C-alpha cells in the first residue's frame, strides 16, 4: 500500500485548526513571527498531540504585516537569531505539553527563497542541525534547500502542493501570477493522485515534471479549503493510499 503524509499550516489565527488536525498526519505550527502567538501555539500543540499528529516548526521572516510573504534581505546572523527564537519558543511549549518537534518547514517567502538561494538554505540547514540534528527539514520537492540540507547531514521531507501550479523546472508558479493557484477541486485531486501514484506533475506549459512526493501541503484557512481537504483524504483512501507521517 502506498503511503503519503498530509501537512497544513496551523496556529495562524484561522478558526479551522481543530477540524483540520483530524485530517492531517503532520502540522506546521506557526512560531509567532508571521502569525499566531503563544496562545495559538499552545492550543495547536495540544490538539496535535491529542490527534497523534506529527509536529513541525513553521518559522518565517519577522513579517506579521505581510503574513511572512515578503522577501527580506537579512544578514546570516539576523536570520539565525530569528530561527533560534522561533524554534526555541515552540520547543518550550512542546516540552510543557509532553510533545516533541519532529521537523522544520520554513514559511512563505523564507520557504521560497531557500528553495533557490544557497546562502539562505545553508543558514537554515545549519541552524536546524545545531538546534537538533534529529530534526528533518521539509521543503519543495527537488529544491536546492533539500539538497543543501542533505549536505548538512539533515534528513529531508519532499513536499508537493495540491493547489499550486508548477513551472517546467519544478518550482511553483509565483503567487503574483494569475495562474498560480489550481482553482478546480477536481483538477487538484487529479494532480495529487498523479504526484503520489506516478511521481510526476503537469507543468503550466504541458510538460511532465518528475516529483518526489513524500508530503502533500493542504490549506485550511477558509471553509472551502477545509471541505477540499476532506475530499483529498477521501480520494486518497479510495485509491488505497494510507495517510501517515
UniProtKB/Swiss-Prot annotation:
The enzyme's E.C. designation: 3.5.2.9
Enzyme class label: hydrolase
A single GO molecular function term of this UniProt record: 5-oxoprolinase (ATP-hydrolyzing) activity
Gene3D superfamilies, sorted: Glycoside hydrolase/deacetylase (3.20.20.370)
GO BP annotations, alphabetical order: carbohydrate metabolic process
CDD domains in alphabetical order: LamB_YcsF_YbgL_like
Alphabetic keyword roster: ATP-binding, Hydrolase, Nucleotide-binding
Catalysis: reaction(s): 5-oxo-L-proline + ATP + 2 H2O = L-glutamate + ADP + phosphate + H(+)
InterPro entries to which the protein is assigned, alphabetical: Glyco_hydro/deAcase_b/a-brl, LamB/YcsF/PxpA-like
SUPFAM superfamilies on file: Glycoside hydrolase/deacetylase
Subunit composition and interactions: Forms a complex composed of PxpA, PxpB and PxpC.
PANTHER family in UniProt: 5-OXOPROLINASE SUBUNIT A, UNCHARACTERIZED PROTEIN YBGL-RELATED
Family that this chain belongs to: Belongs to the LamB/PxpA family.
Function: Catalyzes the cleavage of 5-oxoproline to form L-glutamate coupled to the hydrolysis of ATP to ADP and inorganic phosphate.
Protein name in the entry: 5-oxoprolinase subunit A
Organism: Haemophilus influenzae (strain PittEE)
UniProt lineage: Bacteria, Pseudomonadati, Pseudomonadota, Gammaproteobacteria, Pasteurellales
Gene responsible for this protein: pxpA
Amino acid at each position: 500500500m502506498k503511503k503519503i503524509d498530509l501537512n497544513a499550516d496551523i496556529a495562524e489565527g484561522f478558526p479551522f485548526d481543530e477540524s483540520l488536525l483530524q485530517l492531517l498526519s503532520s502540522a506546521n505550527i506557526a512560531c509567532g513571527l508571521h502569525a499566531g502567538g503563544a496562545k495559538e501555539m499552545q492550543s495547536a500543540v495540544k490538539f496535535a498531540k491529542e490527534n497523534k499528529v506529527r509536529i513541525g516548526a513553521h518559522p518565517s521572516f519577522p513579517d506579521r504585516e505581510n503574513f511572512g510573504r515578503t522577501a527580506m534581505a537579512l544578514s546570516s546572523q539576523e536570520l539565525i537569531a530569528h530561527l533560534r527564537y522561533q524554534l526555541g519558543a515552540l520547543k518550550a511549549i512542546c516540552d510543557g505539553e509532553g510533545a516533541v518537534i519532529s521537523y522544520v518547514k520554513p514559511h512563505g517567502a523564507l520557504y521560497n527563497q531557500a528553495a533557490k538561494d544557497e546562502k539562505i538554505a545553508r543558514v537554515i540547514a545549519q541552524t536546524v542541525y545545531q538546534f537538533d540534528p534529529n530534526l528533518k527539514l521539509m521543503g519543495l520537492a527537488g529544491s536546492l534547500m533539500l539538497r543543501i540540507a542533505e549536505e548538512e547531514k539533515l534528513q529531508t521531507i519532499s513536499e508537493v502542493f495540491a493547489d499550486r501550479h508548477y513551472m517546467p523546472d519544478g518550482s511553483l508558479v509565483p503567487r503574483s501570477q494569475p495562474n498560480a493557484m489550481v482553482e478546480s477541486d477536481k483538477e487538484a485531486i487529479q494532480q495529487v493522485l498523479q504526484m503520489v501514484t506516478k511521481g510526476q506533475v503537469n507543468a503550466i506549459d504541458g510538460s511532465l515534471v518528475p516529483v518526489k512526493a513524500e508530503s502533500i501541503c493542504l490549506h485550511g484557512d477558509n471553509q472551502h479549503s477545509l471541505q477540499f481537504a476532506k475530499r483529498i483524504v477521501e480520494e486518497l483512501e479510495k485509491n488505497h493510499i494510507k495517510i501517515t507521517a
